[in-house]
Amino acid sequence: MSQLAQAFAAHDLKLIEITPVELDRRHWLCVGFEEAGEDRGDFMHLGFLYADQAEFVAAPDLHEAVAGYFSGRDRVLMRLHSECLLGDAIHSTMCDCGEQLSLALNEIARKGEGIILYLRQEGRGIGMRNKLSALSLQYGFRHGQQTGHRHSSDNANLALGHEIDERDYTVAGNFLNALGISSTSMITGNGAKVASIANAGVRIIETVDLWAQDLSDRAKHEMEEKRNRGYRYARYDNDDEEAPARPAAE
């Protein structure tokens, strides 16, 4: 077992594989990992690591290169992204998820270093099957039949017996600790993500505010719901002078 795999195991993670991948003609490293004791099969979490100057692709030992590069590093730019198949892969305009991921990838590449943590948390943790049911409620259907009543995204989850947000980010903090990262700049407006990473002992130097300006009406409504839950998007808020004050995310 490599030193890196041992570090993952020490933080309750199982390191599956590391491989170079090409994203927008740039080489990143994709790290597949699972939570200890949880066999996710093909649905493992993914970490995408970028360090342009490190030349990972030419490294004789990827495990050693990753462990040596990130250990003790400060202000590592990072996006903790929850899976959204419709937004990320199909480029749905119902939400800003795909645009958030694209903006983060581009910003990390521009900076020359960073991490995308891609957690398999479809539908804010309720899974694809339940997400489809929630989307149906949002468009006024139930089991394929028109009901005449449309739910908001949050209320659709509640109507199905779920919490508004069932995600847990412990695994993300464990991942950063396994790499030995000291501090991070997080690309997020979600206070729950910030709090979870901070609770894992990783210092948050700053939060980076990236948001899509050209949103559909549907996506704008999703954004408004998130702001009502305490999300903070400073530039989005400032651009909307009539928006009521939002509670600060802790």
Regions found by a protein language model. Name each.
Residues M1-E250:
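Catalytic domains of riboflavin
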